[in-house]
Amino acid sequence: MRVVSLTSPPDACRAAAVSRAFRAAADSDAVWSMFLPRNLPRFAKGELPRTPPSSKKELFRRLSDQPALLPHKLMSMQLDRATGAQRFTLSARALQNRAPVASLSNCSKGNKRIFSEAAQFYRVNELEIRAKVQRKMLSQNTTYAVYLVFKLEYVYYEFGFPYEVASVGVAGRESTRLVSVQGNIKDGDGDGNAPHRHIFQGCRGTLSCDAITSGEDIHFPRENADGWMEVELGEFHNDEADDGGEVSISFT
């Protein structure tokens, strides 16, 4: 049992298939409690069944199968199925936006996004998004990547800057990178050239943007199956001994 608890959730599932004796050990609460975070956050009402899961393994399955909303429903948490690390997603209401927000639209129809609202921006000459996350909420001794999830409408207004500066800071250390939301890596032809930026139908006619030169180190988004885009803003390591402070994220 001790050996199984030092492996990973997938390894424990494989061990359970070996024999009945292995299954009894691999499915035990003693093993699966090692894969769950030491201090699970509180969840919003109704996120977990009224009847508690019958075992630690069932609780792990629930929290890894789909995200669970935290109190106030501004943030969600999901466990990584392979490692048990906690992954958090912040809603539009949890972000600090400097650009004018036209509305908070309902985005729950036709997709499986856990948050029902998304911020809509119009006439964006300057976009600034900031967020903070308490480090004590995160899994220790784990490297995290930070992503921005968004959609860019085909018809847009005054979105004229080629890229933004993304920054992720923790414990006095900060990493920055250039990020473009107007290109898509699927546009590349596969020979290492930078992808071309899309042609958008603007409010004053069709606007064609030049390609970003290949000499610039620009990070581009990927399109998910649900139609939303995501682009990595940076990464950081949450050390085992660091349980205080916060992670500062900016997109300016």
Set out the residue ranges of the language-model regions:
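The Skp1-binding helix-loop-helix core of N-terminal F-box domains in SCF E3 ubiquitin ligase adaptors
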Residues: 1-12, 21
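Plant-skewed but cross-kingdom recognition/interaction modules and surfaces
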Residues: 2, 20-252
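Secondary-structure boundary/capping residues
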Residues: 12-13, 31
